[in-house]
Amino acid sequence: MTATAESKQRSFPKIEFTDSEAGALEFPSSRSRTFTYYTPAKKRSTMYEDVTVDVQPDPDRHLSQGWIYGFGDGPGGYPQEWTAAKSSNWHAFLDPNEEWDQTIYRNNSKVVHQVELCLSNAKRARVYDGWNTPWLTFISRNLGAWMHAENGLALHVFTSIQRSCPTNMINTAVAVNAAHKMRFAQDLALFNLDLSEATENFDGTAHKEVWQSAPEWQPTREVVERLTAVPDWCELLFGSNIVFEQLVGTLFRSELVMQIAAGNGDYITPTIVGTGEHDYDRDLAYTRNLFRLLTRDPEHGEANKELFGTWLAIWVPRCLDAARALQPIWSQPADKAITFATSFDAATDKFRSLLEDLGLDIPKELDQ
């Protein structure tokens, strides 16, 4: 048998480039040995950006096939319809505090250590023995009542919405806000317990009755409870950090407690309340950035301003009623270093400045 001289012709498929091979796509840092799949805010990406940006993708970014998870009887993922506010790019928001999982524990740990050291030194030096009875009563009733407001906001406002926002950057900032509130409420509870053990003149149970039935605190309690019933996460954030905290929170903490404590021989309370004030300064920074982004949005800015105006019309009157109802507690301490009118004017001036920064109209109720 002889082999055929002719060799069989072989055919090969035509090579087609689909741009799926390595190195085909150009993106930031694509020619570097290390790369990122997003554009950093500055020249180099930060740790915060690396662990938060696009960790929660959506159909507008990367999920071309749509949401890959969701409830069986509901929308998939994190719908933007969970708020009436609109944005042309929710992913443009970055937390100016650059908070992420590690910083929550690191920063809160420092504050907890500071509070524990302050309280242990106070007990060792027996500083509570020098406090007058009216001041002990003021702390037990009013600072104790404020503990309930902080705890309510922590558990039923910020914790409830920290997975409702459309991007991981907003959700992380809200989660940190919840951790701040929760820790501050626990600090106030620890302070209450220490005072109860240190002196017989301090009623460590008075705060519960005050929060539930004292006339001066009922409007504040009503606002907090109304906030917990709001389904729109953006309105919750607006009503809490923009309106309630400005007109009621800073009025009580900054413009009363921090102003009169030293005059009543108390250098412990300002240390503890000051941690809550520092937390709110950081929380207000991210809140201001978020709502400034929404009011300056090229597509939805004007509609958002109109929406926020309706929210102001709802929450400003309620918070003003709560603030004015607190007026009697300004006369309770023995040393009255500041009047309610002075404190109220300072709080409303800060609120006006914040609204002007956001480009919102000043509510007429502030001039009444």
From Swiss-Prot:
InterPro entries: Ferritin-like_SF, MP_mOase_hydro, Phenol_Hydrox, RNR-like. It comes from the Bacteria. It is an enzyme of class 1 (oxidoreductase). Its EC number is 1.14.13.227. SUPFAM superfamilies: Ferritin-like. It catalyses: propane + NADH + O2 + H(+) = propan-2-ol + NAD(+) + H2O. Keywords: Monooxygenase, NAD, Oxidoreductase. GO terms for molecular function: oxidoreductase activity, acting on paired donors, with incorporation or reduction of molecular oxygen, NAD(P)H as one donor, and incorporation of one atom of oxygen. CDD domains: AAMH_B. Induction: By propane. Disulfide bonds: none annotated. The propane 2-monooxygenase multicomponent enzyme system is composed of an electron transfer component and a monooxygenase component interacting with the effector protein PrmD. The electron transfer component is composed of a reductase (PrmB), and the monooxygenase component is formed by a large subunit (PrmA) and a small subunit (PrmC). Probably requires the presence of the chaperonin-like protein PrmG to ensure a productive folding, resulting of a soluble PrmC, which leads to the active form of PrmABCD. Belongs to the TmoE/XamoE family. Component of the propane 2-monooxygenase multicomponent enzyme system which is involved in the degradation of propane via the O2-dependent hydroxylation of propane. Also able to catalyze the oxidation the water contaminant N-nitrosodimethylamine (NDMA). This is Propane 2-monooxygenase, hydroxylase component small subunit.
